[in-house]
Amino acid sequence: MVVANDLSSKILPRVLIVSRRTLRKNKYVDFVGEYHLDLIVSSGAVPVIVPRVNGIHSMLQSFEPIHGVLLCEGEDVDPSLYADDELSDLSPEDMEEIKKAHAEDMTIDREKDSIELTLARLCLERNIPFLGICRGSQILNVAAGGTLYQDIDKELGTTMTTTNHIDYDNYDGHRHEARIVEETPLHKLFEEMEIMVNSYHHQGVKRLAQRFVPMAYAPDGLIEGFYDPNRYDPKEGQFLMGLQFHPERMRLPGSDEFDYPGCALVYQEFVKAVIAFQKKQVNATQVEMKRKTTTLVKSFSQAEFLEANTVLSKQQENRLKQMGATVRNSCVYMKRMKMKEEQERAMDKLSAERLSDMLSFHHMMARLCSNAIKRKLLEPEHTDRTIESSFFLNY
């Protein structure tokens, strides 16, 4: 856990969390569970809430920089986003029963789907750390090309072993068994092969996206956790994990103490990856800025020797003076060019007769100057400067 005093002098990494919408006093209200926020803050990151507002999916670039994304609970994911290539065995009668049993959860929120799928795909493309809890894990699977059961009881309930994945009368107290796969991150975090997990969902992973590997199963065979083995190294800023259960709610009755230390460790490892990712991004930005600065300095009168906080030699000081002279000369040159252009415009306005008179005058002045120079060259004091004077004659 990060001490608050240590955070005041740092710019902390940002973790985006999409809010959920509910109806209160005849008005929609957005909210995010404080359990998630507390765990993110105590682990050393800043939660940035993305409001579930119409049109926000097209404004997500304005939330940059994004160092991590946490997606959590919410309504069912729209089946049209993943079920196009698989025929459902659910009949119209089945769908009616499901709606009656899970009326609130089956209210599709397409704006939230759009926001969260966009963020999940962004994380997949840019290797941004991602943690998906409950619905968030389903979004991650769909974003990567996987599919979902529209209703576990109807589609998976025919197996020999059944599991109660939801208890509307006992949200926090409900538990069911989950068997952890050995040598997976979840096994290392919980140090157990079997744990009792809290969950409330009627959908779940049907076909796991190819890039993911299961970390835990319910007794009925439903995947309770998965990760990308090629994208999991928190110290290096890599974290891509989905958990169907709720580690943030797995607490002892009447206490804030977790059922297992691994519940908080999930968030701590996630934020560890977020911090490492931010550091990499900052370093990459600094390298790019240094590269651009070096290019600029090199292009400025070939001043490769310029480095910050370096004592300059006499030669380097002279080169700096030359650079200054170059800048001054270039300014004079530009002024002369401007004057020349103005003079040319003025000459264009003169008549041919006037221009002819001016040309004759300049030829006469040239002859007079030439004769004067020849006379001076014949004088004794100028005999040792013949070579220099010949230059002017030729000119």
Curated annotation (Swiss-Prot):
Q: Where is the active site?
A: C134, H246, E248
Enzyme class name: transferase
GO BP terms: regulation of secondary shoot formation
Q: Which residues form the Glutamine amidotransferase type-1 domain?
A: 45-280
CDD domains (UniProt xref): GATase1_2
Per UniProt, what is one GO molecular function of this protein?
transferase activity
What does the UniProt induction comment state? Induced by phosphate starvation. Highly repressed following nitrogen deprivation.
Task: State the EC number(s).
Answer: 2.4.2.-
Which top-rank group of organisms is this from? Eukaryota
- Effect of loss of the gene: Enhanced shoot branching phenotype.
Pfam families linked: Peptidase_C26
Alphabetical keyword list: Glutamine amidotransferase, Stress response, Transferase
Please give the coiled-coil regions recorded for this protein: none
What is the purpose of this protein? Answer: Putative glutamine amidotransferase that represses shoot branching. May act as a factor that links nitrogen stress response and branching control. May activate strigolactones by amidation, or represent a new pathway for repression of shoot branching.
Return the protein name: Putative glutamine amidotransferase GAT1_2.1
